[in-house]
């Protein structure tokens, strides 16, 4: 059989990237509302551009929230604190245009209303969960290192190690795979916004020494590994001044970095009655437990819903030929072990908490924080028992 030898690439963006600023603002508003009202319906979209943030969407809640204050606090924490950057938390305009959720949607989602009395899905759609055994977190290696690089960029910016950095940055990691196993890092790309006076050599040396070499293990690099640092040579104008930012524009960064499939629905700004978010988290929980239980080395789970209907219309699993038992049996085990109805997902993963701002930068998956309940592997024993392994 022919040996598979290829290079796969994933990217990440930092908390200061304009699309990520928008995601974090949307989720900060969601958290502020959930703190007061767990039954709120929230669909909050954010646009950020030079000197301005626009908040729009459909929100039905009893909570009283100072939206402009939440927006400004979020922008301040990210680090846009100087109008020389083209975006400043104190002086930017904040426009708010919020409507209520449509009663036609509400009756399908609210328990006891609509054609089906159970809490139904907030929309139709398909969602995917993914896990693989490339890293201890059971995530693809390319996306994990991409996220760690952007996190490290933010860390050295905020603690003053590289005080010439500004909030907007991106990373990209290309890894060589042989027979679907990661063997070496081929290319690392980092672009980071910086102050105007710093030299290119200072930026390049600082990022390679304080970021790349602190994150990428030496055993994964060789003399052919390339570091492309700010390859245009200059990145002073960035953030919302450089590019308009919108909620939901970084869905692959948010998930698995191009590994597996994606149903197209974004996460940020949505309360967990929206299956775009809650069912994607559940898909990760299912896939991670199946891989952790040893049923497969790689696992992709698809679930699909109809608006207003609680039970998923389909559940599919694909192990890419790595399954210890047939995929049809794994799909049955998923149905037996995991309750995939929207209300049950919310209860199992305890999703009515103000935890979402934390998810909105550096990936929704693979970070084993206490709030990220979908990263637990607490179903291993029952899965193994049912699989007979």
Curated annotation (Swiss-Prot):
GO terms for biological process: one-carbon metabolic process; S-adenosylmethionine biosynthetic process. Keywords: ATP-binding, Cytoplasm, Magnesium, Metal-binding, Nucleotide-binding, One-carbon metabolism, Potassium, Transferase. K(+) binds at residue 45. The keyword Magnesium applies. Homotetramer; dimer of dimers. HAMAP family: S_AdoMet_synth1. This is S-adenosylmethionine synthase. It comes from Geobacter sulfurreducens (strain ATCC 51573 / DSM 12127 / PCA).
